[in-house]
Amino acid sequence: MNQIERREFLKSAGLFTLAAAAAPHALAEAPAMSDATRVTLKGHLATVENHLHNGIIPFWFARALDTQYGGFVTNFDEQGKALPCPEKYVNTQCRLIWWFSTLKRRFPEMPKTAEMASQGVDFLIKNFWDQKYGGFAWKVKRDGSELDPAKIVYGESFCIYALSEYYLATGDKRGLEYASRTFDLLQKYAADTQNGGYYENVNRDWSPEAGGFAGGDRKGLDTHMHLMESFTTLYKASGDDLHRRKLLQVIGLIKEEMTDKATGCGLNQFDLAFSSLPAIPIKRTWNGERLGEKPADPVDTTSYGHNVELEYLMHLALKTANQEGDADRAIYRRLLDHAVKHGVDWEYGGIYRDGLRATGEAIVKEKEFWQHSESLVAFLDGYEQFHEPRYLEAFGKIWQFVQDFMIIKGVGEWRTLLDRQGKPIDPNIGNPWKVSYHTGRSMVECRERLMRLLA
C-alpha cells in the first residue's frame, strides 16, 4: 500500500485527519467588546494604516520598477538606496506582481497599480517562461538573459499565486492562462504519484535534482504550504473543480503528514515518503543562500513563523474550498497556542525564529522580518475567530517591537534581521528574497481584520 492508498484507507476509516482526535473547537460567539478593547483595536488600525499608506506602498512604488529593462529591482540598503541588482529571482518578481495586483483589488482607485503589475507580467513571460519545456526559470540576469533555468516548485507556486491574483485584479487572460499552464505542468512532472505531494527541486527539463544540498531527495512544509496558498488563489480565479480537488489534497497531506500529532506543530523536512528528517539548508532557498551547507538542525525543530503562517493560510484555503469544520479550527488553535506560549518573546517583544516542538524551547532567538509579518496576521486571525485575549496581546507585543526596531522611520520598510533585543544584524530592507510580499501583505491583511473587528 503506497502513501496515497494509505491516506485513502485512513480517510474511509474515519482516521485521516490529525484533528479527528482533538476536541472540537467551534467558532466562539463574539462577546461584547469592552471600551478598552475597542480603543486598543482603533489604535492598532491607525498605526497599521499609517505604515501601509505612508510607508510600504510609497516605498515600492518609488523604487521597484526597473526603468531600464522592465520587471522589478529588489535590492536596497537600510536607507532605501538602491544596491546592485545583477539577478532577478522568479519568486520576488512574482511577489511584486502579486503586490501591485492585490493593491489593485483592494484599493481600486489607487493609480498605476495595474500598470506596474502588467509590465511585471510582460517581463516574466518574456524572460522566465521556458519555451521548450514549459514552466518558469528560477532566475535570470537583470536584463532578462538566461542564468539559472532550473524549475523550483517553490518558485512555480509563486508564479501561480501572482498570475492568479493578477487575473482577479485586471481580467487579463494571460494571468489565468499561464497560472493554469504552470499548474498543469506541476501535475504532469512534479507530482509524486507514489507518495503524494510534489517533488520540489527539478532541472530545466523537469528531471529530478541530485540529493543532499541540491534538495532532490527531500520535501518540505514550506513549499507545500505555498502550493496550498497558490492553489487557493488559482481556484478563486478559475472556479475549476480540478484546482479545488488538488487544493484539498495538499491540505490533507499537510494535516496528515507534515504536522506533529503530539504538539500540532509543523515539521520542517522529510524524505520523499514523508519520514521526518533533520532540516538542512538547501540551495535555491532563503536559508541555503544565507547559510550554505551546514550541520542539520535537530529533527524536533519547528518554525514559529511557519506554524502561524500555516494557521491563516489553511483557514483561508478551507474557507475558499467551502470545506472547513470544527476539527480544522482545532488545528488552528494548536498552532497559535504553541506560538503564543513558546514563540512570542514576552520580555522584549517580537517572535523568535525557531524552537523545539516537544518542549517548546526557543533555540534561535533572533528576530527576522517575515516571522513578524506572518504572526501579526495569524494572531489577529485567531482573535477574530476565537476571541482569545492572549492572541490580541501577542499581536500588540509583536507589533510594538516591529514599530520600535524593524520599521525604519522615514524610509518605510523593515530591516531584515535583528538580535533578540532589536539590534540590527542585517539592516538592509530589500534583497532577492525580501520585497513587499510579507511586510505589505501583513499590513493589508491586518487592516482588513481590524476593520471587521471594529465594524
Where are these regions (language model features)?
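N-terminal secretory signal peptides and thylakoid transit peptides that target proteins
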Residues: 1-17
